[in-house]
Amino acid sequence: MPTQTDSFEPLVKKSRKRASVRTMGCRLNQSEGVALEGKLREAGYDLVPFGDPADLGVINTCTVTNEADAKSRNTIRRFTRKNPKATTVVVGCYSQISANEVAMVDGVDYVIGNHDKLNFLDYLSEEKPDSPVVVRERIDREDFSIGLVGEAKFEQRANLKIQDGCDFMCSFCIIPFARGRARSREWTDLLADARQMINKGVRELVLTGVNLGTYQSGGRDFLAMIDGLSELEGLDRLRISSIEPTTIPEELFPRMADSKHPLMPYLHVPMQAGCDRTLKRMKRRYDLEEMDAFFKRATANIPNLCIGTDLMVGFPGETEEDFAKTCETFVDGPFSYSHVFTYSEREGTPAAKSSDQVPMEQRRRRSAHLRRLSSSKRMDFHTGHEGREMRVLLENPKDGSYFAYTDNYLKVRVPVSPQGLENRIAQVRIGQAFPEYCLAELFDWESS
């Protein structure tokens, strides 16, 4: 059985050991995965691709759905089968919520929750433990610091963690239990990290967290934080990853509308449902009338605005009429795409206790239908840009093409000609639209 402990011998560094990190789930977890890799490099490890032979494996897990739990377990088993003598460390949200369940997976040595995730090396002893060691502390509510990214490596676009946790307690959501209550990253720590990322060549920072709009640290709210980052020399682009609709300050609108401002004209707003009855049961903090008015103001004031959303299908009590209303709201709304999620019961949430569960077959059928609608909306978004001239940030070439995103988050594919233009701002002419991207022709770019 797993043992609980809070006292460990520190890890003795050994040169040139190999470590492998696999991060699952959301953009916030991806951001923390980069930090984990940086800490391993600082400790003297060589980072190798997941699946290659390794002395240490770190699996950074997700628990947002039952499927995420299953994927996490499968990933752990895949690593331990490939590396039976390696030390296996499982961190993240699945470790926080279901530590003992994780510890029962064959081959797991350490199970470390979110409070201590980024300090996991402090808990490793020189020898593999006889039984899994579980470290799952209560998550503090105070503002936090992470420290500089150090040896972390970045490409042209990088995630910048500014916030963690959530107080909204929607009836379906496990994240407040996995991530704790809302808290913000200390401004000076955040600013120093952003500066170092820019010095490493990052041109676009993507703000990440659980509930970004609740940011509040050192007298700075979300808007003041945006303004502070926007003043950084060398930062070309600033993008908000996802933000709760009731926390969006409309003072952002003129900043997004200004083509010379770093803040990009892009909003990903997780509506979760397009039906008032379902929104109320979810304990969301708005209704359709409020959201319709907000979106009309946003699109009227921000040219070329891209609005994405999340929609959950099969929430307890959702009728065919409720689902039809959600589809209508999405199709008629200003959305460019939706991420569609099939509702998954999470133990400990109010929704999981409902006697009104929708049969899984119906959930999957509805999800498939809404995904088809989303594909159609995305294609409309793509075709609506054909023939336009737009600004992009060229990323590393792959398969003979640069991939890039416009300011409003349209993905484009540009032939690599000339070469050596990665990480430059360029002008492209949008050509033929495809479901996943648009072809584009390069006609101007900044000098090196």
Q: What do these predicted regions represent?
A:
Residues 1-208, 213-214, 267, 288-296, ...:
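Proteins enriched for Cys/Gly/acidic motifs involved in redox and nucleic-acid/cofactor modification
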Residues 6-7, 20, 353-448:
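Terminal RNA-binding accessory module
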Residues 68-70, 181-186, 216-220, 280-284, ...:
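Short, solvent-exposed loop/turn segments at secondary-structure boundaries
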Residues 88-89, 97-98, 199-320:
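Conserved SAM/AdoMet-binding glycine-rich loop
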Residues 107, 257-264, 332-336:
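Glycine-enriched alpha-helix->loop->beta-strand junction motifs that scaffold or abut catalytic
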Residues 153-156, 166-168, 273, 305, ...:
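Short flexible coil/turn linkers enriched for glycine and charged/polar residues
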Residues 170, 190, 207, 240, ...:
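Conserved, mostly hydrophobic/aromatic
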Residues 234, 252, 334-335, 350-354, ...:
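Conserved N-terminal phosphate-binding loop of PLP-dependent enzymes in the Aspartate aminotransferase
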